[in-house]
Amino acid sequence: MIKFNGLDRIYDAYSWRITHRAKQVWKTGNVVGNRHVEGSYVDQFETSVAKYTKRKYAVAVGSGTDALYFALRAKGIGPESTVACPAISYLATAEAIKRTGATIHFVDVDNKGLISKLPGFGLPDAVVYVNLFGNLADYSILKEFCIKRRIPLIEDAAQSFGSFYNLEQRRC
């Protein structure tokens, strides 16, 4: 039988690290800390992610759905808004948009499941760009389109975290 994916190989390679870290967290009980205790594992995680992605900040949230929701709300997306997102994605993408009260415009994708252009339905208030199956596309055209029109472009990197594009400094 040919497996759809070989996650067992990845687990075998990293399981000792995962188990070791989990034991440390369970032993200390200091997962999120509190306002009087600094240096929790969440703080360490946020610092590491910010450094890895070359961003000033990173904020850990409960799920990727929450991350998308908070990003949309931070850009002012709400009940009167329209948001474009790929027609092929995980349910969380549409769910996060729907939670804001915005109208979703599903956009066709290319053969890798990535948005390559926006259709002529009018300008959306935001675009959620989803990297599927670990693929990163050259989204420079979409980015340029959004920048020129001051449309927020939110990248959903849940399936591509840690990926590089053309070995450049752009990390998800």
Question: Which residues make up each language-model segment?
Answer:
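Conserved PLP-binding active-site segment in aminotransferase class I/II-type PLP enzymes
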Residues: 1-78, 100, 129
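Generic, ordered loop/turn and secondary-structure boundary motif
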Residues: 3-8, 32, 89-92, 162, ...
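Structured catalytic cores of enzymes that bind and process phosphorylated ligands/cofactors
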Residues: 6, 154, 160, 170-172
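Short, intrinsically disordered, charge-balanced linker/junction segments flanking boundaries
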Residues: 24-25, 30, 116, 169-172
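PLP-dependent aminotransferase-like
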Residues: 73-164
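Residues in and immediately flanking transmembrane alpha helices
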Residues: 19, 144, 168-169
